Amino acid sequence: MLDKNAKIYVAGHRGLVGSAIWKNLQDKGYTNLIGKTHKELDLLDAVSVRKFFDEEQPEYVFLAAAFVGGIMANSIYRADFIYKNLQIQQNVIGESFRHNVKKLLFLGSTCIYPRDAEQPMKEEVLLTSPLEYTNEPYAIAKIAGLKMCESFNLQYGTNYIAVMPTNLYGPNDNFDLERSHVLPAMIRKIHLAHCLKQGDWDAICKDLNQRPVEGIDGNSSKEDILAILAKYGISDSEVKLWGTGTPLREFLWSEEMADASVFVMEHVDFKDTYKQGDKDIRNCHINIGTGKEISIRELAELIVSTVGYQGQLTFDSTKPDGTMRKLTDPSKLHALGWQHKVEIKEGVQRMYNWYLGR
């Protein structure tokens, strides 16, 4: 167990997972938390990161900061996804080592697994065949991060644990229509289409003022607003989504991801992540997921039902689906003592309630 007064740095504490980890730590009575916004500390800047570690001397680190996005963003910003994530990891993990951090938790992604991996995916399938092309740069960066943790542990005896969460959603998610992941993107699209159907321009303007789309906000003309929404497949009568709707995905409520992360930080050490006596020590990362899946079409229909939208859902099969099935095997985590509780229907309702309350 960690001392409640231990100095804990949460990198990315304003993001989807980082904010949930921060809240979970506070709820558990931890009193000495450190968080820096991107404006206060640019994790891409090695000099600034070293200065931060020199000054703060954290004892424990949650590395939840990353450059992330959905299929569209991964397709467009390939260089950014590999370069920025490698740089963040290099800086934070490197300075954690140089400053003798007692324990580090690195958050990766299940996109590290091969495109055609056997389902559900066990940790052992890593690097056994090619990755999904659309998110290959991001996946390679995350694989490098987990291998950094593993390699530092093996060479220097550090205690860096890598966890691979499935698709996450929850409070403080990213709802940018170009860069967000599938679930928050669908919630926003269907919500805006519902507002159009209801003629609720106050709600539309409020939404766009909070999250402008390509420079269009609530002060723009109705014509400009309708045009930009149409570009993203949003109208009063229809919501168009990428792909066929047939891929299967697994989703985990972000606050549960945070609980699992804190559980691992408190109770799991590197020696617990592999079989003692193994000649080759690898695949020491831990999947964090539900082990349950839903199709993209079924998810969209669940969101339509939750929002109350009366229009049509259509799928653009000329756009990529990404991996057709991506389900984690969380049995390693279960054996260590943690399991999820929030199912997808309850989670989507919570998510939409949070979105409306912003």
Task: Please report, for each region that a protein language model flagged, where it lies by residue.
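SDR active-site strand-loop-helix element
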Residues: A11, K36, V61-F67, L104-T110, ...
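Active-site Tyr-X1-5-Lys
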Residues: Y133-T166, V182-G199
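C-terminal substrate-binding subdomain of Rossmann-fold SDR/epimerase-dehydratase oxidoreductases
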Residues: G12-L16, A20-K28, L192-R358
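NAD(P)H-binding glycine-rich loop region in Rossmannoid oxidoreductase-like domains
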Residues: A46-L86, E95-R98
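Conserved Rossmann-fold NAD(P)-dependent oxidoreductase catalytic core, especially the SDR/UDP-sugar
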Residues: K4, Q90-N135, I161, N174
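Short-chain dehydrogenase/reductase
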Residues: I82, L86, T134-L146, D176-P184, ...
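Adenosine-cofactor binding site in Rossmann-like domains, unifying the SAM/SAH pocket
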Residues: Q26-K51
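Active-site segment of SDR-like NAD(P)-dependent oxidoreductases
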Residues: V68-G69, T110-E118, T166-Y169
